[in-house]
Amino acid sequence: AERHPDELMEIDVKYVPGTVAGMKYFQYTAIDTASRWRRLAVYDEQTNFHSILFLKEVMEKFKYKIQAIKTDNGSIFTNYYTSMTKRSDMTVKTIHALDLFCKENNIIHYLIDPGKPAQNGTVERSHREDQEKFYEQNTFKSFSDLQIKLERWNIYYNNLEHCGLNGKTPNEFLLNYKLIKPTNVCA
């Protein structure tokens, strides 16, 4: 079956290797599984607040309705397995701030099975690309330097031809669906 760009967005967090000016940072990644279009952001913390902040930014940049997201079971995305108020009946999910945000915005929040990162394979593969082609090739003088270089890397990635897209770039794929305006294609 043909995939459509608004169907599923995989979201994950990657530790930025090493330190930048003595600080640790976290890269949030959202990738559309149909178009491979990505949005990246770096924060100094990984928290529920940052997860929602990042999803809001993704929703703003994509300019189309995200139907569903898929995340791992980290406490920044769910408290299904970690909540202090966990019920003995695991069919009843405890409410997490991200789940509430998704519900308010009519977004389905899927969770991968515990210990099965391959179920979030599109975002995991993109993190490998980030490691090999971005982090191992760059150094960062400051948080601002990291942000600028990461934004450039994101623009490059979204304009890179992908075999899985029959040689199209993620931006070209989305333009064919007329889901984003050309002025928003670069980021």
Where is each model-derived feature located?
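Basic, flexible linker segments flanking DNA-binding modules
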Residues: 1-9, 75-76, 82-100, 175-180
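Acidic/histidine-rich, metal-coordinating catalytic segments
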Residues: 64-90, 113-115, 120, 168-170
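Mobile genetic element proteins and their domesticated derivatives, centered on retroelements
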Residues: 12, 30, 36, 55, ...
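A short acidic/small-residue loop/turn micro-motif
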Residues: 44-48
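Histidine/acidic-residue-rich catalytic or RNA/ligand-binding cores of hydrolases
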Residues: 122-125
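Mobile-element integrase/transposase regions
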Residues: 1-31, 37, 49-53, 61-62, ...
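C-terminal domain-tail junction helix/linker
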Residues: 6-7, 90, 105-107, 116, ...
